[in-house]
From Swiss-Prot:
<dbReference type="InterPro" id="IPR039518">
    <property type="entry name" value="WhiA_LAGLIDADG_dom"/>
</dbReference>
<dbReference type="InterPro" id="IPR003802">
    <property type="entry name" value="Sporulation_regulator_WhiA"/>
</dbReference>
<comment type="function">
    <text>Involved in cell division and chromosome segregation.</text>
</comment>
<keyword id="KW-0132">Cell division</keyword>
<dbReference type="GO" id="GO:0043937">
    <property type="term" value="P:regulation of sporulation"/>
</dbReference>
<keyword id="KW-0131">Cell cycle</keyword>
<protein>
    <recommendedName>
        <fullName>Probable cell division protein WhiA</fullName>
    </recommendedName>
</protein>
<dbReference type="Pfam" id="PF02650">
    <property type="entry name" value="HTH_WhiA"/>
</dbReference>
<comment type="similarity">
    <text>Belongs to the WhiA family.</text>
</comment>
<dbReference type="GO" id="GO:0003677">
    <property type="term" value="F:DNA binding"/>
</dbReference>
<dbReference type="InterPro" id="IPR023054">
    <property type="entry name" value="Sporulation_regulator_WhiA_C"/>
</dbReference>
<dbReference type="InterPro" id="IPR018478">
    <property type="entry name" value="Sporu_reg_WhiA_N_dom"/>
</dbReference>
<keyword id="KW-0238">DNA-binding</keyword>
<dbReference type="InterPro" id="IPR027434">
    <property type="entry name" value="Homing_endonucl"/>
</dbReference>
<feature type="DNA-binding region" description="H-T-H motif">
    <location>
        <begin position="277"/>
        <end position="311"/>
    </location>
</feature>
<dbReference type="GO" id="GO:0051301">
    <property type="term" value="P:cell division"/>
</dbReference>
<dbReference type="Pfam" id="PF10298">
    <property type="entry name" value="WhiA_N"/>
</dbReference>
């Protein structure tokens, strides 16, 4: 069964985007998953992923935006035989494409690891860049079985800062932490994770996430209610037990006939009906129905009298 993260990424790879927004998505995918090699005095670009749908997405975006045909190379990982590595390899127009995506400086040939300023200026490009970043190195926990958590990994601090800035532009309350091998921006609030999925265009995944979240919250609410009711029931049982113990003490040491009539009446009734509620006791009063608070007051008075007699014995 596919993971929730896989379902999100599959949906993202099927979105249609405007060429300018496709550039922003490509910029993230290449900056985060790409590598350059020199072959016959020219650059060869390799963009690597373990997800075949993402590999097809990269291939399609390059063809859509730059009209270049890339090659798709598949490798089997020897250590993990079930896993394949998909490499989108581009041998033509690499310098021009990387320059256009603000990854390569055509004059100095320096590689930029920062989010392009042109992306940070326009919300739709930010959405597309975040989509590419999530496809490249993002993950999200299954909302049905795990704690809520979504993250995007970056190798470089300045790139991580750009991801954080974009996510918080959309009021996602994102946070960041340094890891041994890089940096991550993460979300832990369910509502913000749903908002992020909406931001990057994973609408169906967002709706599924929200459905699961609502059911999970309902289950938690029911459990809290049941626990609260159980706690209240235990308190009621403990209180009734204490009342009966005190009434029996008075019966054996004082005599119920020596109590005031109203207290004697409630004492006899409580002994006869140890399991009923205060409200039910009030309705059973032979001299006439009284309120729950009235019953409670009389029983508290009996407790006080019994405890007053017991204190000298304890001393």
């Amino acid at each position: 069964m596919a993971s929730f993260a896989s379902l999100v990424k599959k949906e993202l790879t099927q979105l249609e985007v405007h060429p300018e927004h496709a550039k922003a998505e490509l910029s993230a995918l290449i900056r985060m998953n790409g590598s350059l090699t020199l072959m016959a005095h020219r650059f060869v670009l390799n963009i690597q992923t373990e997800n075949p749908a993402i590999a097809r997405r990269i291939y399609s975006l390059i063809r859509q935006v730059y009209h270049h045909e890339a090659n798709l190379v598949v490798h089997r990982k020897m250590k993990l035989k079930k896993n394949y590595q998909y490499i989108v390899r581009l041998t033509e127009g690499v310098n021009d494409i990387l320059s256009d995506l603000s990854i390569l400086d055509p004059d100095t040939m320096a590689i930029s690891t920062t989010v392009p300023a042109s992306v940070l200026k326009e919300p739709q490009r930010m959405r597309s860049y975040l989509r590419g970043a999530f496809l490249a190195s993002g993950s999200v926990n299954n909302p049905e079985t795990s704690r809520y958590h979504l993250e995007i990994y970056s190798l470089y601090d300045n790139h991580n800062a750009g991801i954080l800035k974009m996510m918080n532009h959309f009021n996602l309350n994102a946070r960041t932490v340094e890891r041994r091998s890089g940096y991550i921006v993460y979300l832990k609030e369910a509502e913000k994770i749903a908002d992020f999925l909406q931001v990057i265009g994973a609408t169906n995944a967002m709706l599924k996430f929200e459905d699961v979240r609502i059911m999970r919250d309902m289950r938690n609410s029911v459990n809290r209610l049941v626990n609260c009711e159980n706690a209240n029931m235990n308190k009621t049982i403990d209180a009734a037990q204490k009342q009966i113990e005190n009434i029996n003490y008075l019966k054996n040491h004082v005599g119920l006939d020596n109590l005031p009539a109203k207290l004697r009446e409630i004492a006899v009734l409580r002994l006869a009906h140890p399991d009923v509620s205060l409200q039910e006791l009030g309705a059973m009063m032979p001299s006439g129905q009284i309120s729950k608070s009235g019953v409670n007051h009389r029983l508290r008075k009996l407790n006080q009298i019994a405890e007053g007699y017991q204190q000298p014995e304890d001393a």
